[in-house]
Curated annotation (Swiss-Prot):
Classification via HAMAP family: Glycogen_synth
Parts forming coiled coils: none
Gene: glgA
Binding residues for ADP-alpha-D-glucose: 15
Catalytic activity: [(1->4)-alpha-D-glucosyl](n) + ADP-alpha-D-glucose = [(1->4)-alpha-D-glucosyl](n+1) + ADP + H(+)
Key word Transferase present: yes
Annotated organism of origin: Ligilactobacillus salivarius (strain UCC118)
Pfam families: Glyco_transf_5 (PF08323), Glycos_transf_1 (PF00534)
Gene Ontology terms: biological process: glycogen biosynthetic process
GO MF annotations, alphabetized: alpha-1,4-glucan glucosyltransferase (ADP-glucose donor) activity; alpha-1,4-glucan glucosyltransferase (UDP-glucose donor) activity
Matching Gene3D superfamilies: Glycogen Phosphorylase B
Protein name: Glycogen synthase
Length: 476
């Protein structure tokens, strides 16, 4: 089977979030565990690290018609981990300091999507499955059928759309059909690509893709409701026959406390002593009193309302009344950044805040903390709770989306569970679960049992990739 993954970001080349993690891990795992021909196509963001740039080779170049303009498109190639990566090169669109957030986003992704389709014949690779991800590539299934459907070689291509976050849909004015895609406005006027008063890439992808999936089973159910559907719930209910949820995995090689080079001491579920050393080192790194006995509650995240930080801010005064230490790593909303700097200054023995993002420090936090707080308002999948369990740090989560699918709340009667969860999105219920975690922490034998249960969970990509392969096989 010939597979082509299309997306806007991919670890380790460039990433801003979970999409980059999935694009990095899923193709690599399929290539490692099967004999499928696996390839990935990405924009060539010029900020890519030199170690990868130096491995690029030139494949071909051509021009893509974006409205009345002929835009240069170079195709570069890199092979790594049995995966062939193609990079679409255009300095006008992709030679910028960041990945997203520019005035011409619609034009950038219009060029990218048309370039991907036009590239296929030129490189001599016609995939059986073209797997697109989020709105940046969600228009491809529509374009394949309506703009490029006359090309015989393309007619057998099946498409899969993965929704990583439904909040971002790619909404642009009616004029983009003619000005960017050279298509008739009738596709807008008859409602095919329109949602409300805009061309909507995501909605169109849901209509035209052969299969649609989200990154957790619960999120697949949630987005069919008005509360989580971001306006597209009715469309998703109409097409739920082709919708499913597949829980993301995490990279077990990179996220391994027994071998992680970022840690002061390595450890495993059988030998947990090293985790105490990592805790003491983490306390020292954040300027907190070095105490083995005090529970450390950590957060590693973008500081946004989606991640539930309004609950943390509202309850911080109550939280610091307990004998705990709180550690925060992340950047985001300026108000939240200010709040956590204030808490760290006001409670220097209780709160440590690093308003930055540092991958190595994140790994040391996963290892050195006792609890990982993740009170997201909504969470399509979430990877941090899986990583924290892998490192024996018990998650305290709002039970929605992928958090509900991956964290088994502690049952005090049976002693089973891998973390703690609350259903109502409020500071009061969050604090109740934190106190439940603190009570268990005081019982060291029971706590260690739950830590080992959490560390024994299987969130590897080998498990997740098999579900994707099953979906592909249904189409081919």
């Amino acid at each position: 089977m010939k597979l082509l993954f299309a997306g806007s970001e991919c670890a380790p080349f460039f990433k801003t979030g979970g999409l980059g993690d999935v694009m990095g891990a899923l193709p690599k795992t399929i290539a490692k565990t099967t004999d499928n021909d696996v390839r990935v196509v990405l924009p060539f963001f010029t900020g890519m690290a030199e170690e990868y740039k130096s491995q690029l080779s030139f494949v071909t170049s051509f021009y893509v018609k974006v409205g009345w303009r002929d835009q240069y498109c170079g195709v570069l190639k890199l092979e790594m981990d049995n995966v062939t990566y193609y990079f679409i090169d255009n300095l006008y669109y992709f030679d910028r300091p960041g990945l997203y957030g520019y005035y011409d986003e619609g034009e950038r992704w219009a060029f990218f999507q048309q370039a991907i389709i036009e590239m296929l014949e030129k490189i001599g690779f016609i995939p059986d499955i073209l797997h697109v991800n989020d709105y940046h590539t969600a228009f491809i299934p529509f374009l394949l059928k309506e703009k490029y459907g006359w090309i015989n070689a393309y007619q057998s291509i099946k498409t899969v759309l993965t929704i990583h976050n439904l909040q971002f849909q790619g909404e642009y004015g009616r004029e983009v059909l003619g000005e960017l895609f050279n298509l008739d406005a009738s596709y807008y006027d008859d409602g095919t690509v329109r949602f409300d008063t805009a061309v909507n890439f995501m909605k169109t992808g849901i209509l035209y893709a052969d299969k649609v999936n989200t990154v957790s089973p619960t999120y697949a159910s949630e987005i069919q409701t008005e509360a989580f559907g971001q306006g597209l719930d009715e469309i998703l209910r109409m097409h739920n026959w082709k919708l499913r949820g597949i829980l993301n995995g995490i990279d077990y090689e990179r996220n391994n406390p027994a071998t992680d080079k970022n840690l002061v001491a390595n450890y495993s579920a059988k030998k947990l002593k090293g985790k105490v050393k990592d805790k003491l080192a983490l306390q020292k790194e954040f300027g907190l009193p070095q105490r083995k006995d005090v529970p450390v509650i950590a957060m590693v995240s973008r500081l946004t309302a989606q991640k539930g930080f309004q609950l943390v801010v509202s309850e911080m005064q109550n939280l610091v009344q307990f004998d705990v230490q709180v550690i925060v790593l992340g950047t985001g909303d300026a108000n939240f950044e200010h709040d956590f700097r204030y808490f760290a200054d006001t409670y220097p023995d209780k709160v440590g805040a690093a308003i930055t993002f540092d991958v190595g420090l994140a790994q040391r936090i996963y290892a050195g903390a006792d609890m990982f707080l993740m009170p997201s308002a909504f969470e399509p999948c979430g990877l941090s709770q899986m990583i924290s369990m892998r490192y024996g740090t018990l998650p305290i989560v709002h039970q929605i989306g992928g958090l509900q699918d991956s964290v088994q709340p502690f049952n005090p009667v049976t002693g089973e569970g891998t973390g703690f969860g609350f259903h109502d999105f409020s500071g009061f219920y969050m604090m109740q679960e934190i106190q439940e975690a603190l009570r268990l922490y005081a019982e060291s034998v029971a706590w260690t049992k739950v830590v080992k249960q959490a560390m024994s969970q299987d969130f590897s990509w080998e498990t997740a990739s098999q579900e994707y392969l099953n979906m592909y096989n249904e189409l081919v």
